[in-house]
Amino acid sequence: VEEHLAFGSGLSQSSVKSFDLHNNMENIESIKMYVKLECPNAGCNAWDVFANILVKEPVSNEWFEIGRYITPYGVDTSALERGIEIDVTDFKSLLSGTVELKAYIEVWGSDGWNLSVDFDYVEGEPDYKYYQISRVMQHNKNSLEGVIYGEDQSKFDLDKTISFGENIQKAHLRTIITGWGHATPADSDGRRCAEWCCWHTVSMLK
């Protein structure tokens, strides 16, 4: 299913739809998501903007971000055979049966992009029989909604405690950080930090 995401009268930056995905996960080793962007008849939007794909957890109705990307400048993703590839195996428990997906592109023009999303369920020996996801923090409604570099962070609760059950065999932390926003401090050449900076740390205490 291809969706035109754009900004203006009668247009929308987001789309929510339900899909019937693979049912039996017993022999699924990994899941790959492919995000393809094509140019509308008027051409693609000229700017690189924040975009993501989310899946709804059916019990809590919470949205979990399964992939984030930055759109290319004024072109599509045809240089990539199937589009932008994202490994979404961590979200195996949410990508089975009938699922609700949300796509968002923070585009400010009526041109926008034609978006399609595809999944590959790769058969093999799963590393674990069961998967579980716990949200630590999520600030991804738009490009400026998150923790901005160099600015006051007192309004954010950045200390989180996670409890693990006795039957947990392995856990890992998944972070998606795009560094958007042109925030301070500037570098030695006077340029403000944006997606070009790699300034983040994660401290874990047992």
Stretches found by the model and what they are:
Residues V1-K206:
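Extracellular/secretory-pathway and virion-surface proteins
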